[in-house]
């Protein structure tokens, strides 16, 4: 059967709207906004800002999930990608290689022109609420049709190696990433939401949970909530990501072993010190 949702084009972005989003630096890109719609629900379940270059495949730059359930993509924020693109332009040479999760990689390749290890829409892990799990085959097919050609087998295998590297201890994981990058000048780009995605792929090495908290003013109020929640559930560490002015998402690690993974060591978790990581050097 069909997928339980559809992408509906709401708006092709004209020059004025592009200016409002602060995207004038990319005059060669075409921007559009899509709503993700389900039958019987009058509001969109998610909203995506999408860009493409010429006749290229569409690429997500912003994913705003309007439900409490994980849905297709982890939340992405255009503002974060823009500031990251500026940092990459400032700190890396034009022929540097970027290693990051496939969705981040595609967006950064589009915005920075740097080569990335992954260019295809890999769709891993499969992110869907429980009622959608039985539609997995039709969802995967619909996603492939919408986002472009299926990936080559070599890229799928390379991504599996990349995800595995992030789930290993810091030294072994960094060595595996170096092997993937070859002799190139290479930079690893990670986001706190990668914890959730990697946890779905490697549950045996990385136990992850998350909870959304309301924010009023600064993050100090929610942090005390988060610490209490962590203690009540016996989690080992946390990181907080601001989704909007009114909402923050706390990611929790289930145990100390999860905190020893390369990914956890590279992120600003309550138990990590990325600046002191011996296996890699923090740039931004």
Report each predicted region and the residues it spans.
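Extracytoplasmic
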Residues: 1-284
């Amino acid at each position: 059967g069909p997928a339980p949702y559809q992408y509906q084009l709401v708006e092709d972005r004209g020059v004025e709207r592009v200016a409002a989003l602060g995207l004038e630096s990319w005059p060669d890109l075409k921007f559009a906004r899509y709503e993700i719609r389900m039958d019987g629900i009058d509001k969109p379940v998610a909203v995506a800002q999408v860009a493409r270059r010429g006749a290229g495949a569409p690429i997500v730059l912003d994913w705003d999930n309007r439900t409490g359930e994980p849905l297709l993509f982890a939340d992405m924020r255009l503002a974060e990608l823009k500031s990251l693109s500026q940092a990459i332009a400032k700190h890396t040479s034009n022929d540097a290689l970027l290693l990051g999760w496939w969705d981040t990689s595609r967006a950064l390749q589009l915005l920075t022109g740097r080569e990335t290890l992954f260019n295809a829409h890999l769709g891993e892990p499969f992110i869907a609420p429980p009622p959608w799990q039985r539609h997995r085959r039709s969802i995967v097919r619909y996603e492939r049709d919408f986002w472009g050609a299926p990936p080559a087998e070599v890229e799928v295998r390379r991504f599996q190696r990349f995800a595995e590297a992030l789930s290993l201890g810091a030294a072994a994981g960094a060595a595996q990433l170096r092997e993937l990058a070859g002799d190139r000048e290479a930079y690893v780009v990670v986001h706190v939401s990668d914890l959730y995605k990697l946890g779905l792929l490697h549950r045996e090495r990385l136990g992850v949970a998350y909870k959304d908290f309301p924010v009023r003013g600064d993050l100090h109020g929610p942090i005390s909530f988060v610490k209490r929640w962590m203690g009540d559930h016996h989690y080992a560490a946390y990181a907080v990501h601001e989704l909007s002015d009114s909402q923050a998402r706390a990611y929790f690690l289930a145990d100390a072993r999860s905190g020893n993974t390369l990914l956890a060591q590279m992120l600003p978790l309550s138990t990590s010190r990325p600046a002191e990581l011996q296996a890699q050097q923090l740039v931004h």
